[in-house]
UniProtKB/Swiss-Prot annotation:
HAMAP family: ProB (MF_00456). Residues 321-412 form the PUA domain. This is Glutamate 5-kinase. Keywords: Amino-acid biosynthesis, ATP-binding, Cytoplasm, Kinase, Nucleotide-binding, Proline biosynthesis, Transferase. InterPro entries: AceGlu_kinase-like_sf, Asp/Glu/Uridylate_kinase, G5K_ProB, Glu/AcGlu_kinase, Glu_5kinase, Glu_5kinase/COase_Synthase, Glutamate_5-kinase_CS, PUA. Catalyzes the transfer of a phosphate group to glutamate to form glutamate 5-phosphate which rapidly cyclizes to 5-oxoproline. Gene3D superfamilies: Acetylglutamate kinase-like, PUA domain. ATP binds at T175, D176, T219, G220, G221, M222, E223, T224, K225.
Length: 428
């Protein structure tokens, strides 16, 4: 770790929603905001940081171009509008960045692009190479090609996956409020700001995020930002929520982050007992004393506890085609420090239809004395795996010892249902 006096350089992802870039009523671009964002990103680059933008707005710009007031309902129409708008949107970014002689690159992703491990690594290598070349990658979901079943869902999720993909230090989620509140500040004047969240896995007691379903031109809301924060912090990425119409504050917040020691954040995380109240008071006084703009920071899991590259890919890059229900003993064996692979003896039930090496959810159930699944025991989804066997093969060998596989199937492709490198569980 660098000394406190040394300048720290970060990899920073900035996510901008459609409502940050396009007026919800007129559908006109917010060129002033875009210009401020460009100035901020250029300044961050000059400070030595690497920056990636995740930019929504292609569909919104397409609606404006085609003089349409509402988002179409049919998928083909939406994809056509996205194709029209995406070119114009990247053109605006290019024009603004060119005023500073800053080069950009467009990266359009679909979930299909990262379903394969080799493609996932290729995407990772491409973005990192662009950063090393001093280029600003501008990432968006390819709404022209992606289908509903395998979409990222929203660009909050895409920004979290992008952050994990490149091992970013910080993810900034820009929105229409300056931070997370205990309630909607527009409708509840008593809503209190939440400035730091040490551990999202412990929940957010006293915080109501319902009702923030996103704008007319976008798909996100506060709940999707919390999902993104959970994904990113589990991958070791600090995540921040801040107001989009003051993008210059990103630089001020980054300068503040440079003064912090890693131990300071770890101490806050370790001392956190689920009570947010006192913590917010201390954080508010600290930000006020240093004249740091309001924002919410979700502290990332440390290096020992965050998801590694392949684990994150399995959990969040792959789409589950079914589920494998295991007993509690198998789960304990899979999650200990030197975890083992999943053996057929630990499998109680198989759900859905899937092929070899497709992704499945791992669920924990209770085994009855006859070896079948207890229907009264609530199943808990605990992770994901890439299976060495199809669902029909696994149905035949579930509960058996590995040396019985060949007798049952006539062949033995592997003693494991899933090898340990093809298993992933969220940090506990």
């Amino acid at each position: 770790m660098k000394d406190a006096n040394e300048s720290k350089s970060y990899t920073i992802v900035i996510k901008l929603g459609s409502s940050s870039l396009v007026d919800e009523k007129t559908k006109e671009p917010k060129l002033a905001i875009m210009s401020l964002i460009v100035e901020t990103v250029v300044k961050l680059r000059r400070m030595g940081h690497k920056v990636i933008i995740v930019s929504s707005g292609g569909i919104a710009v397409g609606l404006r171009t085609m003089r349409m007031n509402k988002r179409p309902k049919h998928l083909a129409e939406v994809q056509a509008i996205a194709a029209i708008g995406q070119g114009r949107l990247i053109g605006r970014w290019d024009l603004l960045f060119s005023q500073f002689d800053q080069r950009i690159a467009q990266i359009l992703l679909t979930r299909n692009d990262i379903l394969d491990w080799t493609q996932y690594k290729n995407a990772q290598n491409t973005i990192n190479e662009l950063l090393n070349m001093g280029v600003i990658p501008i990432v968006n979901e390819n709404d022209t090609l992606s289908v509903r079943e395998i979409k990222f869902g929203d660009n909050d999720t895409l920004s979290a996956i992008t952050s994990a993909l490149i091992h970013a230090d910080y993810l900034f989620l820009l929105t229409d409020v300056d931070c997370l509140y205990t309630d909607n500040p527009r409708t509840n004047p008593d809503a209190m700001p939440i400035l730091v969240v040490p551990d999202l896995s412990k929940g957010l007691p006293g915080v109501n995020t319902a009702g923030g379903s996103g704008s007319d031109v976008g798909t996100g809301g506060m709940e999707t930002k919390l999902v993104a924060a959970d994904l990113a912090t589990n991958a070791g990425v600090h995540t921040l929520i801040m107001k989009s119409d003051t993008p210059a504050n990103i630089g001020r917040i980054v300068e503040y982050m440079q003064t912090l020691e890693l131990d300071d954040e770890n101490k806050v995380k370790q001392a956190y007992n689920g009570d947010l109240t006192d913590l917010q008071k201390r954080e508010f006084e600290k930000l006020k004393a240093l004249n740091v703009p309001l924002h919410t920071k979700f502290i990332a899991n440390d290096n020992k506890h965050h998801l590694k590259n392949r684990e994150f890919w399995i959990l969040h890059g792959l789409v589950s085609k079914g589920a494998v229900v295991i007993d509690q003993g198998a789960y304990a064996a899979l999650t200990r420090k030197n975890k083992a692979g999943l053996l057929p003896a630990g499998v109680i039930d198989v759900q859905g239809t899937f092929h070899e090496l497709e992704c499945v959810d791992i669920k924990v159930g209770k085994k009855l004395p006859d070896g079948t699944l207890d229907p009264d025991f609530p199943l808990q989804t605990v992770g994901k795996a890439r299976c060495n066997y199809t669902s029909s093969e696994l149905t035949k060998i579930k509960g058996l010892h590995s040396d019985q596989i060949e007798e049952e199937l006539g062949y033995n492709d592997s003693e494991y249902v899933a090898h340990r490198e093809n298993l992933a569980f969220p940090p506990r």
